[in-house]
């Protein structure tokens, strides 16, 4: 089974757990299948390729005659097919052509939720309609329409799902936006983020707060933490964040191999290690004689395709853009800012209408509408694709986006490894506020920052972050002023990072704090 995102794959894997004969079902992302093809074909350096480059090269391998084992299946299911466009759609078409003659396939999708065709641009490419046409016209598939609603638990939610009928009855985008706005007006209003934060913890089941942009998501995430509501950010589909217990256990291993008995002994003395931890790591690095090869495990995990159960998801209310919530469902959904987005004054596009419909169909039991009231003039820096908060003058910057991957480096030689790792294990939690303090020893062309948690160094930023910040504030810095300090970001998660090994300061595994938020600049 191929699903759209890693989050969706995790959900499907959880539901299959304990199901009879579930071992015969393999759930993967399309990016994961591409990686499998490249690995099997022995393509050099594929691990360092971007996800798009992997897709492109895997497509080339299939067209050149590759017959990968991953496609030796009895039936291939592709979910969320309306969001598979461009070269990913081409890869699916080639994969379907590689199936055995007696194998079947099922493509599942909802055309009303198609929000990625808009990314194809003027040059075009294969959209989901082209994918479906190839499946039916060239590969003998037949289309079947499913009209039932199998998700909604509440009559009002069912009304939201049935809004598709109103959208189908009108062609003009402004009228579609108006129709959705009328439907959303029937749902309870939660007021501001600060207002609904008071009663969200009382809701049973899973809760998601959906926004239109990542800048808004970062702001809402911070507001929830300020209100005392634990929250987590929904990550990009291609982001792989490993659970922290891997580093907590494996960093204690001395030598190149660890057997089951020694591993279980270390795991028993470590918090939050699941009972099946050994089995999960063995799937990532099979090894021999009931042992795990430490270097091989680190190398396999660096590939970015860990087995189910090794990715960190986090707890609390999920804060997500609508795009990142695709393929997921929640008991409760708060949609922030639809009145503004669907207002005729904003001249909503077809993509905005589709996004609104997607958001309305994520909830199963409750849908609440909230207002976007925070007075932040969020802007996106086109050169870096990052969000920032401008000042009164065009060149001013009050806040700047920090992403989870910006601290994807070891803490460095200014922090004793053992002390920093122990401090992360015992004193740092998601939601904690951190400061980014300039590290003048490493700040030359671009700034490097030490990550301080209550004054204690726990990490540092990488060159990508320094280059992005420099692109935004270079004019200010060129006047002779020092680089700014950044305050107000938070720990998004603790994660396991892996390296090539080679000593105490270059281990195979270490804990790393992922930091995110709209950090305030202090000059």
Where are these regions (language model features)?
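P-loop NTPase Walker
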Residues: 1-45
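Conserved two-lobed SF2 helicase motor
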Residues: 26-32, 51-58, 315-323
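Conserved RecA-like ASCE ATPase "motif II neighborhood" in helicase/translocase motors
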Residues: 39-73, 85-95, 320
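Extended, charge-rich low-complexity interaction segments
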Residues: 52-70, 144, 172-187, 257-287, ...
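Conserved helicase/translocase motor-coupling segment
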Residues: 192-318, 322
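Conserved active-site motif detector
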Residues: 382-523
